[in-house]
Structure formats: structure tokens, C-alpha cells
């Protein structure tokens, strides 16, 4: 009896004074701990939001620049423009000879001298020297031969269109319809002149 009365109060005291470790794993206790942690971090986030809201929000806004609708190459001159039109073969060769007399360069040309001569020829004639044949140009004769034999002049220039005249054999062909006269001038101009003279 004595031992029973002695042990039971001590057990009761021990149970009341110390919390069992099993109670920590209960769902209610774990939820309370999680809610405390959540409330703690939620409070700090709400405080940060309040602090930001009190500040000047316009200064903290992220400004996204508008999308560029204009090309970056607009109003930028990539190649030089010429006031005069591109020259034909005869005038280009004359210009090369004039440049040759005015610009004295040591032969064989260095890369700098070659670039200087080619750039000046391009400025004066309006005919560019492309990269592939540029490596084979070492003196004025090579540059002259390039403008004489390699450059495709065609008859796109005003001088070329007016200087071209059809041959009599071409005009006599039955299947060829020419819109120019024997001097190379358009036939429409003749019709206009005739209509004006008749009127």
C-alpha cells in the first residue's frame, strides 16, 4: 500500500511537469507550429508590402522601352552616293587614265595603296571593284584591264542608251520589233513631235 501510494504521486508529478514527446507529433500540435511559422513569415511579407506601398511607386516601376519599328540602318549611308550617274566604258577608262596621272603609287601596290586607288576609281566612275578581283589588282594596268574587260556596263546609263544605235541588219529582221529609230531615240518621242507639228 505504501509503495503504491508513493509511486503514483511521483508519476503524476512527472507527467504533469514534463510534456510527452509524442504530443509533438500529433496533428494538432504540428499544425499549430506550422501556423506560427507561417504567420511569422506572412507578417514580414505584409510589412514589406506596406513599406513599398508607402514609397513612391513611380520611381520603382520597371519601364520597358517601346519596340523599335524603325530599322537601325535608316538615315545611315552605307555606300557613297554620286551626283553624276555611273560612267560607261569609254568614260570610265578615260577617268582611270586621269587618275593614273594624278596619283603616283609605287608598284607593286601595297594593300593600303591598292585600297586608295580602287576607292578613288570608284568615286570617279561610280563602278565598284568587288572583293574577288580586288586581290588580283597590283598596278594601274590591272585596274585598267578590270574596268575594260570585267566590269559589266550594259546600256543602263543615259550615255549608253543614247549612244546605242541599231544596225541595219537588226532593223531588217522580220521578227524584231524595235521601239527606237535608226539613231537610238524612242519612237514615242517622234510621234509626239509629229502630233505637235500637225496640231
Swiss-Prot record:
* Predominant place of localization: mitochondrion
The answer, when asked if Mitochondrion is one of the entry's keywords, is yes
Q: What does the record list as GO biological process?
A: mitochondrial translation
> Which keywords does this Swiss-Prot/TrEMBL entry list?
Mitochondrion
Location in the cell: Mitochondrion
Tell me which GO cellular component terms the UniProt record holds: mitochondrial large ribosomal subunit; mitochondrion
Its name, as the record gives it, is Uncharacterized protein C24B10.04
**Organism annotation:** Schizosaccharomyces pombe (strain 972 / ATCC 24843) (Fission yeast)
